[in-house]
């Protein structure tokens, strides 16, 4: 493409359809060579930004021959960029993983870059979809089915010795707006092979970061299991188990609560949630990574492998996400900015029971509820 990217061209650009998908799920070996000719020969690029990945922005594009809408991610060539492409290519074609359709190696402003063409996930983010349901109830059974799908993606990665290391809501996208849309995991910017004990780099998203990432301990696939616990927690109530009380992306207090496993299951949001679900969260959020469930154990847990018989209890999730929409967006922005600024804190991890947790969003909700209650009872409650 020699200097031209989606940032500079008008018109849409989707990736070409690759039968079966490359990588571990498609061609044996999982690695393919990037195409060296201009991406614009095959795709029409658009200025429409679809999202921001760890290492680069994602733009809309269209396959010239088929008209298929795709997503293009531009990475300036570096060992880190090559690693991201390698890991995503290896995983592409796996269940519930965004598929790579093509990769190009082009020059842009005199610099070599890699352009990843992926299937376009037009259904948006996981929690946005739940948030948009309005009065339609989101049930515990639906949460279990979603967790089973995410677990299926992680199981595929872990079975091929890849740790994703950045499993978070923004990286879980739906293929379309339709009811039968498929949820898929994307953005392999922090993914690493786990065969060489290499997972020691402090790059992560604070609200979904495992305790050992915040200290000197090595961490591996169990990081992804911790993230599954946090996502499952949010699915079942609408807010995260850990919060920064200072407004910073991650505060010393929040680090401490993550390290000590300080979270709770407060009412009314958790009053009707099954004990099976709470037990599974406890097993995922263990502060000692050696005690945390493996992905195989997670997939074999009754709440996951018998998700069709999980109670269809209506949850508070959709309402909470909608009511706290502004705060949720702010939290996501904080997480993004924190990726570049967080540093490892070498305090020792200690496990401690918690009687009460100080969750900023939850306290705000409780205060609001107390105000409504006191107004109806005619008493003034601070």
Swiss-Prot record:
Composition bias type Gly residues, residue spans: 20-29
Record's GO cellular component terms: cytoplasm; cytosol; nucleoplasm; nucleus
Modification N-acetylmethionine occurs at: 1
Annotated GO MF terms: ATP binding; calcium-dependent protein serine/threonine kinase activity; calcium/calmodulin-dependent protein kinase activity; calmodulin binding; MAP kinase kinase activity; mitogen-activated protein kinase binding; protein serine kinase activity; protein serine/threonine kinase activity
Residues annotated as the enzyme's active site: 166 (proton acceptor)
Start and end residues of each Protein kinase domain: 44-304
Function: Stress-activated serine/threonine-protein kinase involved in cytokines production, endocytosis, cell migration, chromatin remodeling and transcriptional regulation. Following stress, it is phosphorylated and activated by MAP kinase p38-alpha/MAPK14, leading to phosphorylation of substrates. Phosphorylates serine in the peptide sequence, Hyd-X-R-X(2)-S, where Hyd is a large hydrophobic residue. MAPKAPK2 and MAPKAPK3, share the same function and substrate specificity, but MAPKAPK3 kinase activity and level in protein expression are lower compared to MAPKAPK2.
Record protein name field: MAP kinase-activated protein kinase 3
